[in-house]
Amino acid sequence: MFFTCGPNEAMVVSGFCRSPPVMVAGGRVFVLPCIQQIQRISLNTLTLNVKSEKVYTRHGVPISVTGIAQVKIQGQNKEMLAAACQMFLGKTEAEIAHIALETLEGHQRAIMAHMTVEEIYKDRQKFSEQVFKVASSDLVNMGISVVSYTLKDIHDDQDYLHSLGKARTAQVQKDARIGEAEAKRDAGIREAKAKQEKVSAQYLSEIEMAKAQRDYELKKAAYDIEVNTRRAQADLAYQLQVAKTKQQIEEQRVQVQVVERAQQVAVQEQEIARREKELEARVRKPAEAERYKLERLAEAEKSQLIMQAEAEAASVRMRGEAEAFAIGARARAEAEQMAKKAEAFQLYQEAAQLDMLLEKLPQVAEEISGPLTSANKITLVSSGSGTMGAAKVTGEVLDILTRLPESVERLTGVSISQVNHKPLRTA
C-alpha cells in the first residue's frame, strides 16, 4: 500500500528489498505489508531556550546568560537526513530538542568562559556569532542545522552589571555635561562667528557697493571721454571738410583765373601777331621792325611767364606764397626781357644805337629849346652883316641843331651820319 507524509516530516522504509532503507521527505512511498516497515521522523523547527546559570567568565565574574536557538533536522540534505535518522529515529521531538539543548548549552558555557562580562554585555553580536559557529559545526554531524541563535538576557547576582551600568551612566552623564558645555561653547563660538561673518558680509557688501560705484564712475568717465573725443573728432572733421571745401573752391577759382589769364595771353599773342603784321607793313626800316618785334615778344613772354608763375603759385601754395613766386617770376621775365633786348642790340648794333639816338634826339632838342620857351623876349644883336629878325632866330636854332650830331658824337663817340650810311649787320 501507499503511505504519504507532509513537508514537515520524513518517512523511512526498511525491510524486504529495502537495503539500504529508503528515506522520503515530504512525499509518498509504496510499502509491502508484513515484509516491510515504515517509520516517521519530524522535520519541524525546534525552539530551544538555552540557559547557562552562574557561569564564570574570563575574569572570574559569575553571570547568567539566556539564549534562544532555532534548530531542525535538515531533510533536503540526504547525508544529514541519514545521520539524523541514525541518531533520532524513533525518538520524540522533546527528546531530540533535549539533546540539541544540552549540546548548545555546553558550547554557550565554553564561549562565556573565554570572554569578559564587558565583551558579552557590550558586543552581543560577537557572542552570538561565536556560539552559532561552534554549535553549528557540532550539531551538523547529528543531522541538525542551527537556523538562528540570539542572546536573550544577561544577569548576575553580584550587581556587577548594575555597577557597570552606574559607571557607564556616570560616564554618560559626565559626557553629557561635557557635551552640553561644549555645545554651549560651540554655540557661543558659532554665534560669535555668525556675528563676525554678518559684519564681514556687511563690510564686504559695502566694499562691493563701493567697487560697483567706482566702476560705474570710471566707466561713465571713460564713456564721457569717448563721447567728447568723438564729438571733438566730428567737429574737427567738419572743420577739415570746410577747409578742404574752401581750398577746393580757391583752387577752382585759381584755375579759372589761370584759364582766363591763359585766354588773355592767347589774346595778347594774337594782338602781338597782328601788331607784328602791322609793324611789317608800316615800318620801313628792318632794324626798327625787328627791335619792335623782339620787345613785344619779350613783353609777351614776360606776361605769359608772370601769369603762368602766378597760376602755378596759386595752385601749389596759398596767396602769400603765390605772390612771392609771382614776384620771382616777374623778375625772371624782366631779366629775360633785358636779355632779349641785349641780344637785339648785339644783333643790330648800329641800327639799335641809331634807333636809341633817334628816339632820344627829340628829347635832347626839347631840353635845348626849353629855355627859349620860358623867355619873355629875345633880343638879337647883329654885327651888321647877315639876316635879321625872325629869320635870324630860325637860323640860330637850326645852327644849334646842326651842331647837335657833333655834340652827340663827342659825348657818346657814335657818329650819326656814319651809322646811318652803314649797312645793317646780322649775326
UniProtKB/Swiss-Prot annotation:
**Residues forming coiled coils:** none
GO CC terms on record? adherens junction; basolateral plasma membrane; caveola; cell-cell contact zone; cell-cell junction; centriolar satellite; cytoplasmic vesicle; dopaminergic synapse
Task: Identify residues that carry Phosphothreonine.
Answer: 387
Is Cell membrane tagged as a keyword? yes
Q: Which of UniProt's keywords are assigned here?
A: Cell membrane, Endosome, Membrane, Phosphoprotein
Question: What topology does it adopt in the membrane?
Answer: Peripheral membrane protein
Q: Which InterPro entries match?
A: Band_7, Band_7/SPFH_dom_sf, Flotillin_fam
Q: Which residues are recorded as modified (Phosphoserine)?
A: 19, 163, 385
- The portions of this protein that span the membrane are none
Tell me, what is one Gene Ontology molecular-function annotation carried by this entry? protease binding
Q: Which CDD domains match?
A: SPFH_flotillin (cd03399)
Q: Which domain of life is it from?
A: Eukaryota
Q: What does this protein do?
A: May act as a scaffolding protein within caveolar membranes, functionally participating in formation of caveolae or caveolae-like vesicles.
Q: Which family does it belong to?
A: Belongs to the band 7/mec-2 family. Flotillin subfamily.
Query: What is the recorded name of this protein?
Result: Flotillin-1
Q: Which organism is it from?
A: Homo sapiens
What lineage is this protein's organism placed in? Eukaryota, Metazoa, Chordata, Craniata, Vertebrata
Name the encoding gene, please.
FLOT1
